[in-house]
């Protein structure tokens, strides 16, 4: 190859790469607001699953405050990242003003398919609803516990329970309740 051909090839490649990068940036700039709007709608849907009576959801520093139509506080939704068997488990949990759980949702997990992934099932998550205090422990580890672990996925079950218990302890410490 001649030196001129190599330089021409490099210049053409540089122009194509620069143009492609520019076009990609423009597409991102155009679609980002739509993507953000869609993400916000999905979050609102999730919040309404946890607090069906919630009308307004306000992001605070460490939680989402939930209000009804008359601006009365209904509770809070917390974001938890807890170590599971297969990696981090990302959880959203809602507490009412009395400290009882309104709902739990698993956003992300990488647990063992067919076993640990059962932590996302309604039958497991619904066990937490309406409970507080020692009731949130797995029966296997605490005589006052009311949560059944998933057979073959005790570590995953315990991770969800422990994450919720940590948030509950933090709430109690902040409010001065023992």
Where are these regions (language model features)?
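Flexible, solvent-exposed loop/hinge segments and secondary-structure transition points
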Residues: 2-178
């Amino acid at each position: 190859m001649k030196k001129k051909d190599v330089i021409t090839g490099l210049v053409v490649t540089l122009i194509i790469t620069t143009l492609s990068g520019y076009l990609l940036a423009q597409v991102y700039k155009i679609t980002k607001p739509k993507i953000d709007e869609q993400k916000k709608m999905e979050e609102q849907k999730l919040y309404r699953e946890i607090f069906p009576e919630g009308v307004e959801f306000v992001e605070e520093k460490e939680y989402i405050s939930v209000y009804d139509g008359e601006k009365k506080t209904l509770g809070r939704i917390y974001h938890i990242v807890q170590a599971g068997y297969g990696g981090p488990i990302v959880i959203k949990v809602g507490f009412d003003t009395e400290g009882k759980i309104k709902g739990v949702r698993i956003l992300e997990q990488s647990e063992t398919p067919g076993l640990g992934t059962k932590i996302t099932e309604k039958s497991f998550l619904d066990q937490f609803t309406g409970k507080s205090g020692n009731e949130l422990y797995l029966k296997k580890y605490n005589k006052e516990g009311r949560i059944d672990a998933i057979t073959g996925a005790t570590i995953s079950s315990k991770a969800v329970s422990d994450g919720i218990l940590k948030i509950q302890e933090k709430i109690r410490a902040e409010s001065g309740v023992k």
